[in-house]
Amino acid sequence: MDTSGRKGSDMNIFSLFTLCGGLAFFLYGMTVMSKSLEKMAGGKLERLLKRMTSNPIKSLLLGAGITIAIQSSSAMTVMLVGLVNSGVMELGQTIGVIMGSNIGTTVTAWILSLSGITSDNVFVQLLKPESFSPIVALIGIILIMFTKSSKKKDIGSVCVGFAILMTGMTMMSGAVKPLADLPQFKEVLTILDNPIIAILVGAGITALIQSSAASLGILQSLAMTGSISFSMALPVIMGQNIGTCITALLS
């Protein structure tokens, strides 16, 4: 009795479960981190936006800076929608901030891309988020459990959120490797050769999970295994930027 096919099928199912679990960790970590950062900032971000959006360059830099700080362009967009609806800001003032926010959100992608670094050099290995995320998690847990200051507890939550996020990214990358060798999986990915379909897939997944960073994390996991080429990934990224607009529409 040949059990190799059945064993391979079971492994593929477990890889799919791991991919979904990794995505859940990623989304939860991103949520914990961004909400803790927003809580630390309090109402300062709104006041800062009111004061510094008269100059387009300042607006651009402010949008990029705040998005890098809170690690969520969606949260930034929702904040701007609230300020415009309340009449505090005009629509024209938000253009520079949104452009800056789109620049700032790429920092998340750069951090995630460090997972793909391959080198025997110890210092290069230390740049990989999974190398230092356990230490970051430990620092975060110590701050949460053994400090009384709410600000320090929030910093601890940011650290733990980052560690959970990177754990999810590592899980997704590990799950994609066995799936990449599966003929059926490769066949599904061939639909991305069509740019229109690739844009729709990127927009659909991002709108569904409400996070362009998580959607990009999945894409980077596929790229690390060589499952998709740059030409296939580019329209998906365009779709992801369209899909992330759903947050603004819902708000």
Regions found by a protein language model. Give the residues of each.
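Short, Lys/Arg-enriched N-terminal segments with co-localized hydrophobic residues
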Residues: M1-D10
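Short helix-coil transition sites and intra-membrane helix breaks within transmembrane domains
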Residues: S34-E38, I66-A75, G174-K177, I205-A214, ...
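Residue-level signature of catalytic and energy-coupling elements of molecular machines
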Residues: G29, Q71, I103, G168, ...
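Membrane-interfacial helix-loop connectors
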Residues: M79-I98, A109-S131, T206-G243, S251
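Alpha-helical transmembrane segments and their lipid-water interface positions
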Residues: F25, E38, S74-V78, G104-L112, ...
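Helix-loop-helix hairpins and the membrane-proximal interhelical loops
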Residues: N12-P56, I155-G204, S221-A223
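Alpha-helical transmembrane segments of multi-pass membrane proteins, especially transporters
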Residues: G43, R51, N55, G63, ...
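Membrane-water interface regions at transmembrane-helix termini and the short interhelical loops
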Residues: N85, T118, I139-D154, S251
